């Protein structure tokens, strides 16, 4: 059901809304972590390093599909809210056409640039074969990833946020089972992990199609719904492209960081990859609060309730501070034990590399938590350039820090890059939020 967030205590609205998002995000991370654990423990350090070395490319393709599909389905949700069923079916048809177009466009570009791209990323020769196989299987299976993201986005736009979560859980279980079968029973190695991921995503997409077909007969699209024109296409592109660009800028920053890391060898790559997976899991509560913040802010901005926006941002800022401190304590206390899960008898260099990354990043989780709150608050108020510019700030600071600090400090310089990027971005979005919330409140007060 759709939820009205313009009345009632902000946290009592935001927290229940955030919990399903958190569960879904955690399973999304477990979806990826399961592959890393299975690869690391059953094949070895080099296999884990190969997957880790190209994981930013996988992440880039993933965020592209998420950005596009989330943006496209905004139009679907708007028409559903207006009870424009014919327009909604046209929107779904447009989403399908644009999604297929962009999938094949991305696939074509990746096939053209993958060889020089892997060289530019400094993939060690001993990892190249597995790294190439893994990323190309993911790229060739991009249609499955886009299909799931689009269909789950359509369901969320209709107010159904639980069913995509159920399908994601089922998909995660299928992924783990297939990875074990392909790697251990069939002996397919790293490609087996990629095949398991693609098949699991395709399976979840099929479940979405079946559910939508049976649950929402009003969504059955017909040939006439595919009679598209430029205004219809542009209505979706102007939503999807900015979100895809915003996510892609962050993905490019991670690619540059990984490229610098790849110069230091398999053990450092494995340690860096493992530490980042642990970090992503620890950050999920803060990420989920950010998503909920965007929804809350958007509704209250529409109602011109700037007092509620400021109150919610303040309360969520303090709450995510508590979460960031808790996450820091947990990662500091149990980080090495968790890292040990990923590999069977990891070398001291792997453990040291992972621990060093944690040592530098955990103390600044607070700054990262504030980025999620303030950036999403700006997004909810319709100031879409701030999230995009904040991504550019992160990209520039992360890239400069990684490239220049890695020369005198080696691998340790890479670990310094993330805190520098986060602190810079946090200062930017904090200042931008306070500027625009005052500006917009003054503007609409004068209008009213």
Spell out what each predicted region is.
Residues 26, 30-49, 118-125, 181-188, ...:
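Helix-terminus/linker motif at the lipid-water interface of multi-pass membrane proteins
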Residues 48-108, 145-164, 271-335, 368-390:
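Small-residue-rich hydrophobic transmembrane alpha-helices
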Residues 45-56, 131, 135, 194, ...:
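Small-residue hotspots at the loop-to-helix junctions and early N-terminal turns
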């Amino acid at each position: 059901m759709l939820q009205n967030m313009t009345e009632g205590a902000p946290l009592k609205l935001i927290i229940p809304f955030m919990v399903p998002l958190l569960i879904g995000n955690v399973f999304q991370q477990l979806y990826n972590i399961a592959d890393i654990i299975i690869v690391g423990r059953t094949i070895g350090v080099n296999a884990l390093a190969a997957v880790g070395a190209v994981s930013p490319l996988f992440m880039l393709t993933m965020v592209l599909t998420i950005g596009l599909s989330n943006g496209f389905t905004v139009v679907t949700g708007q028409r559903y809210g207006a009870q424009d069923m014919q327009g909604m079916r046209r929107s779904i048809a447009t989403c399908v056409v644009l999604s297929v177009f962009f999938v094949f466009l991305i696939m074509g570009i990746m096939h053209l640039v993958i060889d020089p791209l892997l060289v530019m990323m400094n993939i060690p020769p001993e990892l190249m074969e597995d790294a190439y196989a893994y990323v190309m299987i993911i790229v060739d299976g991009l249609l499955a990833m886009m299909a799931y993201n689009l269909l789950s986005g359509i369901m969320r736009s209709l107010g159904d946020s639980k069913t995509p979560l159920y399908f994601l859980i089922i998909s995660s279980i299928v992924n783990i089972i297939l990875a074990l079968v392909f790697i251990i029973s069939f002996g397919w190695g790293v490609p087996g992990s990629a095949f398991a991921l693609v098949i699991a995503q395709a399976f979840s997409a099929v479940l979405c199609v079946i559910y939508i077909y049976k649950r929402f007969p009003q969504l059955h699209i017909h040939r006439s719904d595919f009679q598209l024109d430029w205004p219809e296409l542009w209505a979706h592109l102007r939503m999807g492209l900015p979100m895809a660009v915003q996510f892609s800028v962050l993905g490019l920053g991670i690619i540059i960081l990984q490229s610098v890391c790849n110069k230091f060898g398999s053990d450092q790559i494995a340690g860096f990859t493992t530490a980042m997976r642990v970090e992503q899991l620890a950050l999920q509560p803060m990420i989920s609060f950010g998503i909920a913040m965007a929804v809350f802010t958007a509704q209250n901005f529409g109602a011109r309730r700037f007092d509620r926006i400021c109150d919610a941002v303040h309360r969520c800022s303090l709450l995510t501070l508590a979460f960031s401190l808790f996450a820091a304590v947990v990662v500091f206390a149990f980080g090495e034990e968790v890292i040990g899960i990923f590999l069977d008898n990891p070398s001291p260099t792997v453990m040291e590399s992972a621990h060093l990354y944690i040592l530098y990043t955990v103390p600044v989780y607070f700054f990262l938590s504030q980025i999620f709150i303030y950036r999403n608050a700006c997004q909810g108020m319709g100031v879409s350039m701030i999230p995009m510019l904040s991504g550019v700030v992160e990209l520039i600071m992360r890239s400069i820090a990684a490239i220049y600090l890695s020369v005198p400090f080696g691998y340790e310089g890479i670990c310094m890059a993330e805190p520098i990027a986060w602190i810079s971005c946090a200062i930017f979005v904090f200042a931008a939020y306070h500027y625009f919330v005052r500006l917009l409140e003054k503007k609409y007060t004068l209008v009213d």
